[in-house]
């Protein structure tokens, strides 16, 4: 199985990404499945050089995940009479390497155990009672250190730390009911981190809201995170569809830490988000680092809150070639005020003005087993002051264009 995407921005940011996975079934003769997934993405700034040298500005992410799935619940043990619907147990080990150009290199690795239940054809439950991740900041640059010396929240989010978490996810999908022309898909997920460890400390006499408690000599994260997403596919006619999507998320850190881990925070933009803007190029809120080094500001374009809305009209052109026009909107925000990122906190009175907006068009070559997609995003509105009056405030038309080549539909 292979997924591929390539993104190009008019500001010379170019980046491919790919996911390659291999699966071996019936590993032990009892229906077990062993899987390996390798993913990677790379982005470089084609029109800029570092400090006058020939080195290109580049960032990359690499990830390796191995899974072993048993087609039953291993613990506790249920009889077939107690559980007469599909269920499975999955053990997972993973490692993710994140390199941010000129700033830092972060390694996150860990493992988890989860249960999957499907009591009906349309409902799916996923329970992860145990997940432990360790974030290791491997390398920082002088430029990064100079930023974190004044931006304590960013420094805290990237510190070496454990993330002991548990998760529950519910998914509803009525697409298996083939008699319906219109399809609904929605998912809700909640993650809690650090509560059990904090409870153990509380039993030992430590105050619940006291910070800097540790696990094996390193701090551990404590937060609650929730996301919800809904998609609706409405059939207009022969191979014509109006597809809508809404997504919202929030993460709140408390107790042992007031800043959530960097890789748990929200970001926006890219081939499956607001296609006129590249990943981590907007937000939080109206925040904008107005300096010569703004192209590197993606390191702190993360937030505690996220809202995103997409509307796409899909239509046939010729044979397996289809077209699409779309409208994308959204942003991320901070829950707490951060003086290092002015304008980043959510203010309900300016919510609509804070939403970035983009439109565009695309082509899809649908071969049933694979969809090859090319989208052109066109920026209409940026949430921060660009110096241009009016709702359409893109300084130059070409600055608000994004080009995306990908495998699969965006949603």
Map each language-model feature to its residues.
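Strand-loop-strand
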Residues: 8, 24-26, 71, 339-367, ...
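Glycine-centered small-residue hotspots that permit tight backbone geometry or close packing
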Residues: 110, 129, 270, 356-362
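Flexible, small/polar- and glycine-enriched "cap/hinge" segments at structural transition points
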Residues: 328-330, 335, 360, 364, ...
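A cross-taxa feature marking solvent-exposed loop/turn segments within ectodomains of secreted
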Residues: 13, 29-31, 237-239, 318-320, ...
